[in-house]
Regions:
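Short glycine-rich, low-complexity segments
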Residues: 1-23, 37, 42-113, 134-177
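Short beta-strand-centered aromatic/proline hotspots
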Residues: 22-29, 116-122
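Short aromatic-glycine-enriched beta-strand elements
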Residues: 35-38, 126-131
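N-terminal mature ectodomain segment of secretory-pathway/periplasmic proteins
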Residues: 28-36
Length: 177
């Protein structure tokens, strides 16, 4: 993982031994012994936000293969880029959350069975509080979740971008998001 970060290589990061078709593709933005932050790129070689994972969930990393090279080439040919921010290598998660909060980006928190999406209200060493927004961009309450229950955190992926567009549209049209 560190090699891919240091050499700026597009990597495929695998998290589920039971489902090898599911992987995250992109540049490793930051990593340490416990955390990995991926500047995610979709299957069309386009910007797809950031995905945070616990390093212990990663069981395989591929790089320099045909697929990774294709995605990297498309990303360059399409003049794609990720917003620049300098995550603190000692605390990648909080760097990402501060970036999302300051940029007013939607965040999705996933556990084994569920996911919740929303705007950050607050966060601490033990929990995250979101103003939740449903898939239609409508405000749906407040969720407080224990960080120990969260497996994956996504910021500004295609899904969050679409929901944010809907939420912004609802707000502009006088609806409560």
């Amino acid at each position: 993982i560190k090699f891919c970060r240091d050499k700026r290589k597009v990597a495929n990061v695998y998290l589920d031994k039971e489902d090898t078709c599911h992987h995250l593709t992109g540049y490793i933005t930051a990593c340490n012994d416990d955390e990995v932050l991926i500047a995610h790129i979709n299957t069309r070689g386009e910007y797809d936000g950031f995905v945070y994972e616990y390093a212990s969930n990663v069981y395989r990393v591929d790089y320099d293969g045909e697929y990774e090279n294709k995605i990297g080439t498309l990303y360059k040919l399409k003049h794609q880029s990720h917003p620049q921010f300098e995550p603190d290598e000692e605390n990648i998660l909080f760097s990402l959350l501060k970036f999302a909060e300051n940029s007013k980006l939607l965040v999705s928190l996933e556990d084994e069975e569920n996911s919740v999406t929303g705007f950050l209200k607050s966060f601490s060493d033990t929990q995250i509080e979101l103003e939740t927004v449903n898939e239609y961009g409508k405000y749906s309450g407040v969720t407080v979740i224990d960080l120990e229950m969260v497996e994956t955190i996504s910021v500004d992926t295609d899904y969050e971008q679409d929901v944010k567009l809907l939420a912004d549209n609802n707000t502009e049209n006088g609806s409560v998001c």
